[in-house]
Amino acid sequence: MTSEKFFHSRTAIITLFAACLVVLISLGVRQTFGLFFMDFNESLKISNTAFGFAIGLQMLMWGLTGPIFGAIADKYGGHVAIISAFIFYVAGIFFLYTGPNTGIFFQIHMGLLIGIGLGGTAISIPMSIVGKHFPLSTRTIAMSFVTALGSFGYFLSPIFTSYSLKEFGWNYTLFVFGLLLIAGLIAAYFVRSPSDSERVEKNSEQSFSEALNEAFKTKSYVLLVSGFFVCGFHITLVGTHVPKYVIDRGLEDWTAAAILSLIGLFNIFGSLLSGYLSAKMSKKIILSAIYFLRGVSIVFFIFTPASNISAFIFGASFGFLWLSTVPATSGIVAHLFGTKYLGLLYGIVFLS
């Protein structure tokens, strides 16, 4: 009877809801940075090159610190890792708000600090902690809830940001983001790793180094890491540069915000479907289909005439595929190596 339960402990319930809130806030804020470019360009004289470099540095730090926060989460608990990361995230937004934001300071605030914060608050660490609370039969479904409910941040944040930037300016918008991140920091306290009595499967006896050695000797894991490079490239390209791209093609700024919101809205359904299918069929086939369809969506968007209709179709189709890779990918990692070092091993995948 116990094995048929979806939730195996009270901690699992609290952790799932808290992780959803953490991801909603963390990725919701991150999703909107592309909308700030015009304001930063006019007010701070941030060039397209400087902005792009900061986002690139941010992504690099996000990836590099993911395995570190994953190892911290595996050893000391998810809440320790995520709270630590939120401190960096809040600091980055705070210094963007207060300044100075010229030259190297902009790179430190937008790139270094926020990037480190994302390494522990974005999807990989909260999801890996949730995965530790669920058995193989329901793990990908539980993980898909984190992705799907977190997507409300993707959906709501661009709408708020577009309105706030027009009505109140970038300073006020960043101030609100700071408050939201503090709320996320509080929620992070409740993202707890299961105790020994709450574990749904026995931990392996492997050491940290043995787990890493086995992972990189496993062909499937190496291919998974390589494939996720493409996933990260897609997401960063679209989230950062599509807002300016549609404006350059003659569309209005509200269309850019609408694309990001549609991505968030349709990602809810795509993530849930991916999680459900990953529990029923081959995760490899699901991932292959997602990557193929992403390519089709991008080609359609580039080669069709610029219009609101084509932009909305792209937002909806790409949104359906946006983070639908995550439940299948994390499910494969957990299936191959168990959950003891899931934070570390999935963090390495996310690094790519």
Regions found by a protein language model. Give the residues of each.
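Residue-level signature of mid-helix packing/kink "hotspots" within the transmembrane helices
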Residues: Q31, M59-P67, Y154-F155, G264-L272
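Extracytoplasmic gate region of multi-pass secondary transporters
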Residues: F33-F37, N213-S274
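Helix-loop-helix hairpin linking two adjacent transmembrane segments in secondary transporters
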Residues: F145-D196
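C-terminal transmembrane helical hairpin of 12-TM major facilitator-type secondary transporters
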Residues: I263-N267, S278-I332
